[in-house]
Amino acid sequence: IIVSLVGSEMCIRDRIKWLLPLLLGYTGGKMVYGHRGGVIGAVTTAAAIVGTETFQFLGAMLVGPGSAWILKKVDGALQDSVPEGFEMLYDNFSLGILGLGTSVVTYLGLAPILTAISDGLGNFASGLVESGLVPLADIPIEVAKVLFLNNAVNHGVLTPLGAAESAEMGKSIYFMLEANPGPGLGLLLAYWFAGSGMWKASAPGSIIIHFFGGIHEVYFPYVLAHPIMIIAMWAGGISADLWFVATDAGLVGPASPGSIFAFLSMTPRGGAVGVLGGVAIGAIASAVVGTLLLRARPIQETDAGVEDEISTSIPGVDV
């Protein structure tokens, strides 16, 4: 049994170190330049993994799309001049040579930079943990989220920190800092209770998509349209994080997408009170503060152009 448990832990660690970054690198490259972009993205990501000791989610998000973009530009410049019948030869050799080049540059040039960034973030996070100031991290996290940088923050920064801590402690609070669905739920409840117009009408549908589907992006327009509501998000996030710290709560792995179901699936045995309590507290705090803000400063719907533009980001809304 002990051998199987150790083997399982090593398997999980290897998947976090190799499989997940490679998938990120391939997916990022494929989004830029199809299958060829995905292949060179994965190859270059492997160089980032080999060149560092830390989990390279951030590196994969950078070098995957970056190397695919380089290949796309090279193909655009050279493919028209390839003689007929030599297309396959060009495809294979160009990808291989460019993949070697981007891998060498990543290994020798970018790997030390990525290591320095990871070490800096790790030291910063350790300082927050030791000083008990982890909840304050929610302030920049929420701002980054509503600017649609949530995936970069979660997978590029928090997931590697959480993976390292989880490998040592069996769970980590870092997996919950960005992915907690509680504050977003509270914000949408506030709009449902105290909002008006399309914001009030669309809130129930957005709640289902956000809380159960884990698509946090659905509530970002609600903050961008009324920026003072970021205070409600801070209230919910900081309150939840204080509870997580007080109860020593954590998840065993990343909850992605940030759905309540993903949270439950990653909750360690005996840790449901800490995890679910933080979700509930975050939702209540965000809902109360958000309702007060909407009562004090109601959202204005006078700019039809802005309203039309934002409504396209909210499911089930026709203006």
Where are these regions (language model features)?
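Hydrophobic alpha-helical transmembrane segments
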Residues: 40, 58, 62, 135-136, ...
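Generic multipass alpha-helical transmembrane bundles of integral membrane proteins
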Residues: 103, 107-212
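Single conserved hydrophobic/aromatic residue that forms the stacking wall/gate
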Residues: 1-7, 11
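Transmembrane alpha-helical segments and their short flanking loops
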Residues: 159-169, 221-318
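Hydrophobic core segments of alpha-helical transmembrane domains in multi-pass membrane transport
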Residues: 4, 22-30, 45-48, 64-71, ...
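Alpha-helical membrane segments and immediately flanking helix-loop junctions
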Residues: 16, 20, 28-32, 173-243, ...
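Membrane-interface helix-loop-helix junctions at boundaries between adjacent transmembrane segments
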Residues: 44-129
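Structural signature of hydrophobic alpha-helical transmembrane segments
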Residues: 9-18, 56-69, 131, 176-179
